[in-house]
């Protein structure tokens, strides 16, 4: 595993002090590296990580296997429900039914000491209720690590709510098996993008210095303009590129739509 940067080290030290930790982490900051790094440094600590989808689950499992980390089990909300509560199906409907019937676990819950919930900005009230039931049924004190990014909420249409991240302490503190105080931490250092990309995102999309990059990269040229004049702006930029030696094959246009009012893009 890579050595921790100062942000990751701070989270590690908070966890060593037995705090429950809430982490606001921008894209590419190494959340998985942080969790697995902690697991590697604390091999006797049994960890359960719950994340939103199968792809994220597989990524953590593959990284754990690659680094011979054996003290972490990884589930999605659905696979966790299936293992302990659902006799058939992986659907929200089945989870809702299990909660309504207050199903008891079908088998003893595998021991863990730390619960990691990732991508919490995508948590729905249903998944929150599932985790409350699961923690209550487990019935032993645990430590929590909550990870997410309020700017990456993708599933509002499914009922997700970023307040499960932004208000996490108030939401989780009432549970009797979370006895330690909550502390907040942030991760801003992204390994996924270059410094010019980070500058572009901060200035044009976020309006704040939220992302920090470590990789150098080519300068990013960008134009901020009213969308009502976008066709003329794009035509000007294309003509300028062609006049400066670029060929048509060097130019790629990405638009929200190329139909209807935006058909000028095709011209």
Task: Briefly describe each language-model feature range.
Residues 83-119, 123-134:
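Conserved RecA-like ASCE ATPase "motif II neighborhood" in helicase/translocase motors
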């Amino acid at each position: 595993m890579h050595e921790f940067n100062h942000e990751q080290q701070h989270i590690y030290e908070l966890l060593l002090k037995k705090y429950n930790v809430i982490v606001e982490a921008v894209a590419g900051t190494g959340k998985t590296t942080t969790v697995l790094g902690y697991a590697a440094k604390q091999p006797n600590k049994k960890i359960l990580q719950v994340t939103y989808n199968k792809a994220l689950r597989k990524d953590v499992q593959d990284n754990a296997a690659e680094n011979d980390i054996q003290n972490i089990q990884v589930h999605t909300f659905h696979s966790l429900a299936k293992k302990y509560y659902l006799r058939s199906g992986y659907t929200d409907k089945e989870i809702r039914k299990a909660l309504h019937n207050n199903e008891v676990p079908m088998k003893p819950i595998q021991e863990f000491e730390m619960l990691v919930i990732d991508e919490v900005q995508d948590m729905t009230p249903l998944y929150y209720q599932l985790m409350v039931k699961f923690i209550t049924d487990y019935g032993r004190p645990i430590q929590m690590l909550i990870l997410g990014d309020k700017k990456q909420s993708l599933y509002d249409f499914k009922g997700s709510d970023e307040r499960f991240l932004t208000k996490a302490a108030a939401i989780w503190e009432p549970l009797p098996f979370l006895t330690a105080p909550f502390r907040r931490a942030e991760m801003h250092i992204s390994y996924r993008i270059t410094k010019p990309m980070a500058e572009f995102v901060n200035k044009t999309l976020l309006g704040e210095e939220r992302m920090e990059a470590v990789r150098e990269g080519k300068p990013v040229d960008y134009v901020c303009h009213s969308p009502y004049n976008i066709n003329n702006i794009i035509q000007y930029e294309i003509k300028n590129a062609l006049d400066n030696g670029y060929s048509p094959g060097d130019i790629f246009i990405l638009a929200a739509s190329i139909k209807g009012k935006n058909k000028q893009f095709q011209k």
